[in-house]
Protein backbone atom coordinates (compact mmCIF):
# COMPACT_ATOMS: atom_id res chain seq x y z
CA UNK A 1 0.00 0.00 0.00
CA UNK A 2 1.36 3.41 -0.91
CA UNK A 3 0.17 6.72 0.44
CA UNK A 4 -0.06 9.54 -2.04
CA UNK A 5 -0.96 12.23 0.49
CA UNK A 6 -0.17 11.48 4.16
CA UNK A 7 -1.89 14.68 5.38
CA UNK A 8 -5.17 13.82 3.61
CA UNK A 9 -4.94 10.25 4.93
CA UNK A 10 -4.38 11.48 8.51
CA UNK A 11 -7.30 13.94 8.42
CA UNK A 12 -9.60 11.34 6.86
CA UNK A 13 -8.60 8.85 9.57
CA UNK A 14 -9.33 11.43 12.30
CA UNK A 15 -12.71 12.25 10.74
CA UNK A 16 -13.70 8.58 10.46
CA UNK A 17 -12.66 7.77 14.05
CA UNK A 18 -14.48 10.85 15.35
CA UNK A 19 -17.64 9.81 13.50
CA UNK A 20 -17.49 6.29 14.99
CA UNK A 21 -16.91 7.70 18.49
CA UNK A 22 -13.37 6.56 19.27
CA UNK A 23 -11.44 8.44 21.95
CA UNK A 24 -7.91 7.76 20.66
CA UNK A 25 -6.56 7.51 17.13
CA UNK A 26 -3.09 6.47 15.95
CA UNK A 27 -1.80 8.23 12.84
CA UNK A 28 1.05 6.78 10.83
CA UNK A 29 3.29 7.70 9.15
CA UNK A 30 4.08 10.82 11.16
CA UNK A 31 5.63 13.94 9.65
CA UNK A 32 6.49 17.47 10.71
CA UNK A 33 3.62 18.87 8.63
CA UNK A 34 1.06 16.55 10.24
CA UNK A 35 2.43 17.50 13.67
CA UNK A 36 2.05 21.21 12.94
CA UNK A 37 -1.50 20.72 11.62
CA UNK A 38 -2.38 18.76 14.78
CA UNK A 39 -0.93 21.60 16.89
CA UNK A 40 -3.19 24.15 15.14
CA UNK A 41 -6.19 21.86 15.67
CA UNK A 42 -5.26 21.52 19.36
CA UNK A 43 -4.81 25.29 19.81
CA UNK A 44 -8.30 25.86 18.38
CA UNK A 45 -9.89 23.22 20.63
CA UNK A 46 -10.73 20.52 18.08
CA UNK A 47 -8.53 17.75 19.54
CA UNK A 48 -7.07 16.98 22.95
CA UNK A 49 -3.45 16.08 23.65
CA UNK A 50 -1.29 14.39 21.05
CA UNK A 51 2.12 12.79 21.31
CA UNK A 52 4.78 11.44 18.97
CA UNK A 53 5.73 7.79 19.43
CA UNK A 54 8.99 6.56 17.87
CA UNK A 55 8.59 3.19 16.17
CA UNK A 56 11.91 2.92 14.32
CA UNK A 57 10.37 4.05 11.03
CA UNK A 58 8.55 7.31 10.41
CA UNK A 59 6.86 7.36 13.82
CA UNK A 60 3.26 7.46 15.01
CA UNK A 61 1.08 10.23 16.45
CA UNK A 62 -1.29 9.25 19.26
CA UNK A 63 -4.18 11.75 19.23
CA UNK A 64 -6.92 12.09 21.85
CA UNK A 65 -10.29 12.97 20.32
CA UNK A 66 -12.74 15.09 22.32
CA UNK A 67 -15.78 14.91 20.03
CA UNK A 68 -15.67 18.44 18.61
CA UNK A 69 -14.92 17.66 14.94
CA UNK A 70 -17.87 17.48 12.55
CA UNK A 71 -15.70 17.22 9.44
CA UNK A 72 -12.08 17.74 8.49
CA UNK A 73 -10.16 17.18 5.29
CA UNK A 74 -7.26 18.23 3.14
CA UNK A 75 -7.64 20.87 0.44
CA UNK A 76 -6.34 19.67 -2.90
CA UNK A 77 -4.83 21.29 -4.87
CA UNK A 78 -3.11 23.47 -2.31
CA UNK A 79 -4.51 26.80 -3.47
CA UNK A 80 -2.38 29.92 -2.99
CA UNK A 81 -4.27 32.62 -1.11
CA UNK A 82 -3.45 36.30 -0.67
CA UNK A 83 -3.84 38.12 2.62
CA UNK A 84 -7.24 39.52 1.56
CA UNK A 85 -8.48 36.40 -0.28
CA UNK A 86 -9.59 34.15 2.59
CA UNK A 87 -13.29 34.97 2.34
CA UNK A 88 -13.73 33.16 -0.98
CA UNK A 89 -12.30 29.95 0.47
CA UNK A 90 -14.24 30.34 3.74
CA UNK A 91 -17.44 30.32 1.69
CA UNK A 92 -16.29 27.28 -0.27
CA UNK A 93 -15.00 25.02 2.53
CA UNK A 94 -16.67 26.15 5.78
CA UNK A 95 -20.41 25.81 6.48
CA UNK A 96 -20.95 29.26 8.03
CA UNK A 97 -19.15 32.49 8.82
CA UNK A 98 -16.95 32.30 11.96
CA UNK A 99 -17.52 28.54 12.20
CA UNK A 100 -14.49 26.31 11.67
CA UNK A 101 -10.96 27.06 10.52
CA UNK A 102 -8.86 26.82 7.41
CA UNK A 103 -5.28 25.68 8.06
CA UNK A 104 -2.73 27.67 6.08
CA UNK A 105 0.98 27.20 5.45
CA UNK A 106 2.63 30.63 5.51
CA UNK A 107 6.18 31.92 5.51
CA UNK A 108 5.92 32.16 9.32
CA UNK A 109 4.70 28.58 9.79
CA UNK A 110 1.44 26.63 9.79
CA UNK A 111 -1.49 28.51 11.37
CA UNK A 112 -5.23 29.05 11.17
CA UNK A 113 -6.63 31.48 8.61
CA UNK A 114 -7.83 33.79 11.41
CA UNK A 115 -4.30 34.16 12.78
CA UNK A 116 -2.92 34.67 9.26
CA UNK A 117 -5.51 37.44 8.69
CA UNK A 118 -4.45 39.18 11.91
CA UNK A 119 -0.79 39.02 10.88
CA UNK A 120 -1.57 40.07 7.28
CA UNK A 121 -0.12 36.93 5.71
CA UNK A 122 -0.99 34.90 2.65
CA UNK A 123 0.04 31.33 1.99
CA UNK A 124 -1.17 27.96 0.76
CA UNK A 125 -4.34 26.27 2.01
CA UNK A 126 -3.70 22.87 3.58
CA UNK A 127 -6.90 21.76 5.32
CA UNK A 128 -10.27 22.69 6.78
CA UNK A 129 -11.80 21.72 10.13
CA UNK A 130 -15.25 22.38 11.58
Swiss-Prot record:
Name of protein: Small ribosomal subunit protein uS8
Keywords: Ribonucleoprotein, Ribosomal protein, RNA-binding, rRNA-binding
Name of encoding gene: rps8
Assembly and binders: Part of the 30S ribosomal subunit.
InterPro entries, A to Z: Ribosomal_uS8 (IPR000630), Ribosomal_uS8_CS (IPR047863), Ribosomal_uS8_sf (IPR035987)
GO molecular function, one term: rRNA binding
GO cellular component, one term: cytosolic small ribosomal subunit
Function comment: One of the primary rRNA binding proteins, it binds directly to 16S rRNA central domain where it helps coordinate assembly of the platform of the 30S subunit.
Species of the source: Methanocaldococcus jannaschii (strain ATCC 43067 / DSM 2661 / JAL-1 / JCM 10045 / NBRC 100440) (Methanococcus jannaschii)
Single GO biological process annotation from the record: translation
Family designation: Belongs to the universal ribosomal protein uS8 family.
Amino acid sequence: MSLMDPLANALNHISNCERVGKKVVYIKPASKLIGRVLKVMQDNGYIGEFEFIEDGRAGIFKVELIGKINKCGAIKPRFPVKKFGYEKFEKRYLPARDFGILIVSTTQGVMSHEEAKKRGLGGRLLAYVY
